[in-house]
């Protein structure tokens, strides 16, 4: 049986090329000549692919009834098949059933319905953003450089400018000239509270009348009043110079800041009785004044030993305060006064309160605490403060060296006294007379005549003279030493 198999041109070309390489040179030359005359096909044309047909979405391809091609069946097989069909009950599809099943796949299978598209309502119009049509839209977020910023923002709170205003007012040609000649030029640059610095500076210059004129000028400008800061500064200046009668105002309606300024002005002006009366009136009216007012009053009254009883009363009042607010300087000043008055318990409580407020004590506060315990003759407790001061790496000043050396002399601790005396010189301080005297006394107690003579030489070089008591003790030590030698 001869089978005819058609072969494409490209396949025959490759077969001919392969056979030509084996042995037929003549055929190769013919093919080569033909290849030169005919254009070579590209690869995709030589081996074309069958294009993919798009799927038919009208009918489900998986449930389509397959097509059965007729096969050539022998007679014997046909007889066997017929016998089998006769024996078995074959399932026969009726036309109605076939039509019903095929109708299910004529259309695309419905998918899950999508959510209905939701139309969001427009936002309500905002009245503050509506602008009339035809106007240009203003620029937003404009960044201004410091050079282009308003001059008033740079001037109204500048201390040098405000103090300069006070100097210009002071330099007016005559006392009859009004302060408006200076202030009118800068009225657009001033704000509330600006002139309080100018008024205080006029008070330091001794010009209470000019301060009062400045306050009255500010009252005429609505953007500068009402302002308690200007009023408080004016009252403090007038009270300091005993000119409160020049200003008329209602004390009962005065604010806390105004009353505090009045008390401070009275204290600075020496009106201690008036200041004390104002404090008592405020207490009776259940007005709680700032702690700094009590501190200022205590420091001023403590200058007079005859009024120590008033200081004790104010200290008791200050002790009752739960919201105690003291600066480091005020706390140290109160501790020093308490040491003078012998109120050592109050010194201890103030020192503990200050450390409990998470603040580091200064060398002045440490020195005051050591002096307090030394005055109470609690030398060992005072030594603990010295170690605490050294652990805090606090640099000692001359008063601190004086108190520490005095403490070591009281403890008869010659070694530590000598060490701190050497540290004092290394720090560049010049010993005072009481330090020389304490060192001579501790050397005398230990019988160190040579060291005593060295200290006496330093005293002479410093241009000082020993007192009679110290000189007498040196003579006794010298006599004892001479008697031991003989």
Curated annotation (Swiss-Prot):
Region of interest (Disordered), residue spans: 111-137
Keywords in alphabetical order: Repeat
PPR repeats: 290-321, 327-361, 362-396, 397-431, 432-466
Protein name as annotated: Pentatricopeptide repeat-containing protein At2g01860
Lineage: Eukaryota, Viridiplantae, Streptophyta, Embryophyta, Tracheophyta
PROSITE patterns tied to this protein: PPR (PS51375)
Pfam family, one: PPR_long
InterPro entries on file: Pentatricopeptide_rpt, PROP1-like_PPR_dom, TPR-like_helical_dom_sf
Protein encoded by which gene: EMB975
Family to which this protein belongs: Belongs to the PPR family. P subfamily.
């Amino acid at each position: 049986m001869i089978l005819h198999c058609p072969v494409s041109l490209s396949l025959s070309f490759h077969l001919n090329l392969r056979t030509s390489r084996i042995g037929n040179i003549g055929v190769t030359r013919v093919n080569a000549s033909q290849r030169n005359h005919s254009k070579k096909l590209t690869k995709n044309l030589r081996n074309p692919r069958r294009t993919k047909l798009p799927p038919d979405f009208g009918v489900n391809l998986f449930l389509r009834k397959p097509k059965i091609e007729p096969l050539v069946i022998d007679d014997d097989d046909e007889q066997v098949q017929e016998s089998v069909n006769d024996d078995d009950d074959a399932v026969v599809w009726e036309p109605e059933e076939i039509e019903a099943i095929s109708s299910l796949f004529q259309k695309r299978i419905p998918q899950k319905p999508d959510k209905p598209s939701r139309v969001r309502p427009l936002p309500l119009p905002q009245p503050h953003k509506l602008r009339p049509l035809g106007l240009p839209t203003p620029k937003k977020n404009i960044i201004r450089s410091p050079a282009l910023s308003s001059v008033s923002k740079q001037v109204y709170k500048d201390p040098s400018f405000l103090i300069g205003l006070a100097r210009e007012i002071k330099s007016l040609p005559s006392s009859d000239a009004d302060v408006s000649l200076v202030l009118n030029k800068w009225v657009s640059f001033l704000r509330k509270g600006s002139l309080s610095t100018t008024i205080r500076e006029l008070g330091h210059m001794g010009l209470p009348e000019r301060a009062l004129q400045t306050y009255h000028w500010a009252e005429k400008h609505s953007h500068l009043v009402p302002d308690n800061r200007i009023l408080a500064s004016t009252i403090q200046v007038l009270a300091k110079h005993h000119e409160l009668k020049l200003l008329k105002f209602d004390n009962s309606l005065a604010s806390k800041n105004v009353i505090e300024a009045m008390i401070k002005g009275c204290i600075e002006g020496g009106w201690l009785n008036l200041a004390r009366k104002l404090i008592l009136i405020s207490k009776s009216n259940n007005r709680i004044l700032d702690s700094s007012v009590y501190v200022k009053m205590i420091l001023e009254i403590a200058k007079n030993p005859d009024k120590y009883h008033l200081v004790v009363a104010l200290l008791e009042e200050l002790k009752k305060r739960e919201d105690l607010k003291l600066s480091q300087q005020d706390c140290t000043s109160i501790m020093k006064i308490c040491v003078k008055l012998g109120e050592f318990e109050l010194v201890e409580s103030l020192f503990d309160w200050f450390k409990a407020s998470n603040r580091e004590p200064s060398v002045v506060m440490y020195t005051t605490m050591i002096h307090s315990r030394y005055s109470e003759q609690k030398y060992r407790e005072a030594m603990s403060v010295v170690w605490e001061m050294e652990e805090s790496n606090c640099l000692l000043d001359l008063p601190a060296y004086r108190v520490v050396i005095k403490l070591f002399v009281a403890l008869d601790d010659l070694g530590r006294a000598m060490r701190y005396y050497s540290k004092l010189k290394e720090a560049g301080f010049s010993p005072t007379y009481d330090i020389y005297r304490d060192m001579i006394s501790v050397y005398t107690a230990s019988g160190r005549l040579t060291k005593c003579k060295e200290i006496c030489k330093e005293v002479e070089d410093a241009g000082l003279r020993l007192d009679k008591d110290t000189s007498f003790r040196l003579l006794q030590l010298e006599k004892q030493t001479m008697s031991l030698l003989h």
